[in-house]
Swiss-Prot record:
It comes from Fischerella ambigua (strain UTEX 1903). InterPro entries: Isocyanide_synthase_DIT1, PvcA. AmbI1 and AmbI3 alone are sufficient to generate Z-3-(2-isocyanoethen)-indole from L-tryptophan and ribulose 5-phosphate, but AmbI2 and AmbI3 are not, suggesting that AmbI2 is functionally redundant in vitro. Keywords: Lyase. It comes from the Bacteria. Belongs to the isocyanide synthase family. This is L-tryptophan isonitrile synthase AmbI2. Involved in the biosynthesis of ambiguines, a family of hapalindole-type alkaloids. Responsible for the synthesis of the isonitrile group on tryptophan using ribulose 5-phosphate as the source of the carbon atom. Pfam families: DIT1_PvcA. Its EC number is 4.1.99.25. It is an enzyme of class 4 (lyase). It catalyses: D-ribulose 5-phosphate + L-tryptophan = (2S)-3-(1H-indol-3-yl)-2-isocyanopropanoate + hydroxyacetone + formaldehyde + phosphate + H2O + H(+). GO terms for molecular function: lyase activity.
Length: 330
């Protein structure tokens, strides 16, 4: 497509787009001035990619590895199906793309690179549940008319292999050695924080899945799994970067200020790591937020169903009409 604006104009527009996206950044730390006023180093890893699309008058393309499958830990989540947490998050992503079109007419597109198939066997999720979860995500996107969002997953890449063979091929072609990952975790603060976050999730889940085992044994086994999750997740990142070389990389994990990935908040959380697939959702009368299912039940929150399925919690003191009109909020 022919360029229609000059480089100076494209840089100004691209910076406006990035600063808008940065309003929703998920950061490792919130103590630096960059939290409120992103600096040139914050913009630098992404500016050229955004400019590529602006200079070609094309929608900005974001890629987001996310929406894998629900955690198998029913102390955290309501079940295996997407619920209000996923609905709110998908609507946020569509809204973000729509908002960008107010800054830049071609707008934005976003590809969810669903990574559930990549490491489901490591996190205690069956391939059947990954498939069901993905099908419902697609149905929600269609129901919402979320035309800016599409989904890519591992079976789109390797159509003629079993799920186990897909995972093996991914690691063989794109994976680092476990030794290299251990070295990175040992010597890089961000990699160490990532490992600790993944290890914590795994320990929480396997304490429920394998309650007959000691905590020490579970922690040790989950260390091995955490390294493999990182190995496959990194391999997935390399693959999608190869497929989408110009695209802007979003992440559901918190990132450093000047990272090559933009950590993104899709829904209110109590911590930096919360996601809809590791939590339940509660409506407080004004907005939705993520909390562990067990915490909400212990606090007396009321379960609300949609179409016969558990969807979210609401505080019991909220008037009934608030719950009835909850769809207006999202």
């Amino acid at each position: 497509m022919t360029q229609i604006i000059n480089i100076t104009q494209s840089k100004v527009i691209s910076e406006q787009i990035l600063r808008h996206v940065f309003r929703h950044r998920r950061l490792i730390s919130d103590t630096e001035p960059c939290v409120h006023q992103p600096c040139s180093l914050c913009l630098a890893p992404h500016l050229e990619k955004v400019q590529y699309f602006v200079e070609h008058n094309e929608p900005i393309h974001f890629i987001l590895p996310a929406f894998p499958a629900k955690s198998p830990n029913t102390q955290k989540v309501l079940g295996t199906m997407p619920d209000m947490g996923e609905q709110v998050s998908l609507k946020f992503l569509q809204s973000l793309c729509d908002q960008i079109s107010e800054i830049y007419a071609p707008g934005a597109k976003l590809t969810i690179c669903s990574d559930g198939r990549v490491f489901s066997d490591l996190v205690g999720v069956t391939d059947e549940n990954v498939t069901l979860y993905g099908q419902i995500i697609q149905a929600l996107l269609k129901e919402m008319k979320a035309d800016a969002i599409d989904v890519f997953n591992l079976e789109d890449m390797y159509t003629d292999l079993s799920f186990d063979e897909m995972r093996q091929k991914l690691v063989k072609l794109y994976g680092q050695t476990i030794e290299a990952i251990k070295d990175a975790v040992k010597n890089n603060d961000h990699q160490c924080q990532m490992f600790n976050g993944i290890h914590r999730f795994l320990v929480e889940d396997y304490q429920v899945l394998e309650a007959h085992k000691s905590r020490n044994k579970i922690r040790l086994e989950c260390k091995t799994r955490a390294y493999e999750v990182i190995q496959r997740s990194n391999a997935w990142s390399v693959l999608i970067s190869e497929l989408y070389p110009h695209s802007v990389r979003l992440s559901i994990h918190p990132q450093h200020y000047h990272s090559e990935k933009i950590g993104i908040h899709m829904i209110k959380t109590l911590d930096q790591w919360g996601t809809p697939w590791h939590n339940a959702t509660v409506f407080d009368g004004k907005e939705f937020m993520l909390m562990k299912r067990s915490h909400l039940e212990s606090m007396g929150a009321t379960l609300v169903c949609q179409n016969g399925h558990p969807s979210y919690f609401a505080w019991t003191e909220q008037p009934l009409e608030t719950r009835i009109t909850v769809q207006e909020v999202i």
